[in-house]
């Protein structure tokens, strides 16, 4: 959004219904400093958003579920509108035996923990040889300790629904680091699990 505004474009912003307070903050701030006719914040529901997508945009950037992403994609096709669809997925990281494990672990943990892991392009799982696993986990735990100072309550999840969904994914897994949760604060400590079966829900 910042890049689009800086380049001189008008921008229509549709906040997520999961982050209502942030959406209102964004709406209030934009109205205070920018022309709301050029930078409107749209609060419509799913059906109203579909109507909005009937307009001819120069570019559409969407972050959200794959289900509604299909709707965005179909609407963009009507005008051959360029799109970026950021809809999650499994993002593997492969560690070669020649890699600097400390550097790799630090970068992977930073990418995974940014915004409490709630970004669609975050690293999702690590592929490495068994001989590298122990040292990787050691460096990953050290990185998490530097980032969070062992505070399990520094990673809030956006909604109670997603808190329950994510904590449910940990059931039956071997936890190598982290694992503490706080339902009241919707916090999940950054957690590393190992030797996950390929058919486990966390890998789907």
PLM segments and residue spans:
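Rossmann-like NAD(P) dinucleotide-binding subdomain of oxidoreductase/dehydrogenase enzymes
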Residues: 1-103
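Short, intrinsically disordered, charge-balanced linker/junction segments flanking boundaries
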Residues: 1, 199-204
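ALDH superfamily catalytic-core signature
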Residues: 34, 67-201
């Amino acid at each position: 959004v910042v890049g689009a505004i800086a380049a001189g474009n008008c921008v229509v912003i549709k906040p997520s219904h999961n982050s209502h307070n942030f959406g209102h903050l964004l709406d209030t701030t934009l109205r205070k400093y920018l022309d709301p006719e050029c930078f409107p914040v749209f609060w419509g529901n799913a059906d109203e958003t579909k109507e909005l997508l009937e307009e001819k945009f120069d570019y559409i950037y969407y972050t959200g579920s794959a289900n509604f992403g299909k709707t965005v994609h179909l609407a963009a096709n009507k005008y051959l509108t360029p799109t970026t669809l950021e809809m999650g997925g499994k993002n593997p990281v492969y560690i070669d035996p020649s890699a600097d494990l400390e550097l790799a672990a630090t970068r992977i943990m930073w990418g995974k923990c940014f915004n409490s892991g709630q970004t669609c392009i975050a690293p999702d799982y690590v592929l490495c040889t068994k001989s590298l696993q122990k040292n990787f986990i050691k460096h990953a735990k050290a990185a998490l300790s530097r980032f969070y100072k062992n505070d399990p309550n520094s990673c809030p999840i956006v909604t109670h629904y997603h808190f329950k969904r994510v904590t449910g994914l940990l059931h039956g897994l071997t936890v190598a680091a982290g694992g503490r949760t706080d339902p009241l604060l919707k916090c999940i400590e950054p957690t590393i699990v190992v030797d996950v079966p390929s058919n486990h829900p966390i890998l789907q």
